[in-house]
């Protein structure tokens, strides 16, 4: 029996232990969900096929709308050969103020050869007083492609709330086969000087990262340099605080500012361009973003 299932079934503590497993495969000219399993309050809200190429758009929802102290939330998602899945959420995620215990989120993404995964959750809000630990592990096979992002908002901006208590620990790793391509680790506590330092957050409330791995045929320096220059031109036209770098053949974008909508618009625009360059696909934003 799955460890998460055991904990969920036997624990009497007032915490949520939730896990969602999804598998996607290509069948009859479109991507379908071949595997779905969940424990606790997390599930697929809806699947859509808005693109002529049969790309599957899946909306995942966590009904408590956030993660509180003691909660454990796990996502395990896999795409099989030729599958193309776009995964998003219906609204902002939340790390709630702690009850004294740490909250955990684990994301495991496995992208098989010749498949594409787009992982595009909406922003996550870190409430003042939250104790949050998040880990993301992405494993790509040799010819797999990936586009994904993570957006973090410190405090509730509508209440002019700052992050003065609590702590946040985030680990991100992106692998191709057994080779580590990207490793990011971030840790800070409420009120840290790093939050106001020009070497850190510089008193900004929104920080975000975007990663993209092209199909194998576009991984040469010729194509990568050409595409990153086109993205730089896009960012300049949009006049947003985004920086771009290449880590081997991984395109990385970073946002640091105070407006999460500008971040979302910038990342969505980058994603739209890369879809056109790499996959010859239209932008086709998830419909839930328009509601």
UniProtKB/Swiss-Prot annotation:
InterPro entries: UreD (IPR002669). It holds the Pfam family UreD. Coiled coil: none annotated. It is found in: Cytoplasm. One of its GO terms (molecular function) is nickel cation binding. The keyword Cytoplasm applies. UreD, UreF and UreG form a complex that acts as a GTP-hydrolysis-dependent molecular chaperone, activating the urease apoprotein by helping to assemble the nickel containing metallocenter of UreC. The UreE protein probably delivers the nickel. Required for maturation of urease via the functional incorporation of the urease nickel metallocenter. This is Urease accessory protein UreD.
């Amino acid at each position: 029996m799955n460890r998460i299932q055991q904990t969920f079934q036997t624990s009497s503590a007032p915490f949520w232990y939730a896990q969602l497993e999804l598998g996607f495969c290509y069948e009859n000219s479109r991507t379908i969900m071949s595997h779905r399993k969940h424990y606790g309050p997390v599930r697929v809200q809806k699947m859509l096929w808005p693109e002529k190429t049969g790309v599957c758009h899946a909306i995942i929802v966590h009904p408590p709308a956030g993660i509180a102290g003691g909660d454990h939330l796990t996502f395990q998602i896999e795409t099989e050969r030729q599958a193309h899945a776009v995964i998003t959420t219906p609204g902002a995620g939340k790390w709630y103020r702690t009850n004294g215990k740490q909250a955990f989120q684990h994301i495991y993404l496995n992208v098989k050869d010749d498949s594409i995964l787009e992982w595009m959750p909406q922003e996550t809000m870190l409430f003042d007083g939250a104790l949050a630990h998040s880990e993301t592990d992405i494993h790509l096979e040799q010819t797999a492609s990936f586009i994904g992002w993570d957006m973090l908002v410190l405090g509730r901006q509508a209440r002019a709330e700052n992050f003065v208590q609590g702590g946040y620990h985030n680990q991100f790793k992106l692998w191709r086969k057994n080779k580590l391509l990207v490793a990011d680790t971030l840790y800070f506590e409420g009120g840290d000087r790093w939050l106001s330092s020009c070497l850190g957050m510089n008193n900004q409330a929104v920080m975000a990262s975007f990663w993209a791995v092209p199909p194998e045929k576009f991984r040469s320096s010729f194509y990568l340099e050409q595409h990153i220059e086109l993205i730089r031109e896009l960012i300049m036209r949009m006049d947003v605080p985004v920086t771009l770098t290449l880590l081997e053949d991984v395109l990385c974008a970073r946002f640091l500012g105070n407006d999460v909508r500008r971040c979302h618009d910038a990342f969505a625009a980058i994603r739209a361009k890369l879809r056109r360059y790499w996959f010859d696909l239209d932008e086709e934003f998830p419909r839930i973003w328009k509601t």
